Swiss-Prot record:
Coiled coil: none annotated. Belongs to the peptidase M16 family. UQCRC1/QCR1 subfamily. One of its GO terms (molecular function) is metalloendopeptidase activity. Residues 1-26 form a transit peptide. Gene3D superfamilies: Metalloenzyme, LuxS/M16 peptidase-like. Transmembrane segments: none annotated. It is a peripheral membrane protein. One of its GO terms (biological process) is mitochondrial electron transport, ubiquinol to cytochrome c. The keyword Glycoprotein does not apply. It comes from the Eukaryota. Its main location: mitochondrion. This is Cytochrome b-c1 complex subunit 1, mitochondrial. It is found in: Mitochondrion inner membrane.
Amino acid sequence: MLRTVTSKTVSNQFKRSLATAVATPKAEVTQLSNGIVVATEHNPSAHTASVGVVFGSGAANENPYNNGVSNLWKNIFLSKENSAVAAKEGLALSSNISRDFQSYIVSSLPGSTDKSLDFLNQSFIQQKANLLSSSNFEATKKSVLKQVQDFEENDHPNRVLEHLHSTAFQNTPLSLPTRGTLESLENLVVADLESFANNHFLNSNAVVVGTGNIKHEDLVNSIESKNLSLQTGTKPVLKKKAAFLGSEVRLRDDTLPKAWISLAVEGEPVNSPNYFVAKLAAQIFGSYNAFEPASRLQGIKLLDNIQEYQLCDNFNHFSLSYKDSGLWGFSTATRNVTMIDDLIHFTLKQWNRLTISVTDTEVERAKSLLKLQLGQLYESGNPVNDANLLGAEVLIKGSKLSLGEAFKKIDAITVKDVKAWAGKRLWDQDIAIAGTGQIEGLLDYMRIRSDMSMMRW
């Protein structure tokens, strides 16, 4: 008995009741005397460090005639010649474009900040003309045209999402595809890239970011000592703001095996006070994949009808936010093309519930899912992804919410908030529709539009 008691006493002395909390990197932002904004998130446990420039101009800053110029700049930065030079220095390159921003990132081992900045400064910022040699430009353009053609022919879900933007934001900046079109890319010349860079790659429209194992003061000192200088100028302002228009675009193709459909209402811009409410509302319905057994057990009411009648192969609800506007809706793919009308009807009837009968349980479940999603995004462990996220948020908001701050905002959302948001954004609101494949069963626009409300008495 004595031995047993002693054993328990000793074991309790060394037993830990809680795991050590992992500190989330905190964003630090500094504006230098030359106008350059520097933002970092230091993660001392990271095995790499990423340094780059994020510009607040993406596809939305293009026009129908130079659409795709950002995509060309991205691929020129990542060209074989430039990547080979970087590899010799022990560096890796990455670039990303969206509708609101584009980034050019150099990754290295910790302690190589100066080397990364030297490469970024010499090969891109100060000597962009070297990247635009005739042979390099034509080779990159040919490669991009092939990529876009492959996207148009094979990536049906994302192609439909691009068409959803084009119809929802007709004749406004957000309507332009991020990759460009075959027609616009074919007509681009070196002068188009030079003009875009001169107007948008400016210190007033940029954030120099550092993520991973790199300290804020080290990056600031390196930038000042290396005389990193971006072209000066006034930050460009979009002449036309995004405006949502209820409309549709259909590309019926009965040779395809399925129907791909996206449907959305106007969503929330990034700086909206209802940004997280919209995100949470999308998580109430979440996503579904008919071929994953666990996906069928989520407790989403919409799945009762979808599984009983096998209405779709998958769906995903989204809340996409941009500077001026956003899209809130869902994308789906289905082989059951004779029951598309039922799929849309049951989905929109569930949307109606957000205004009149969403429950506390559904909201709490959505909070958990949204926090999990944000946690995975904020703590991805990938400095390149962190750099893109940091730069995009600092450009639009001037800072970046910590994970704890984001969680507090999510926890503060109530059922009343969701109902109020849905009453404003969903109930009896115009919709945008895009579809391709076997969409004969996607019936008349006004029939679908009438499902955005219901008789409550």
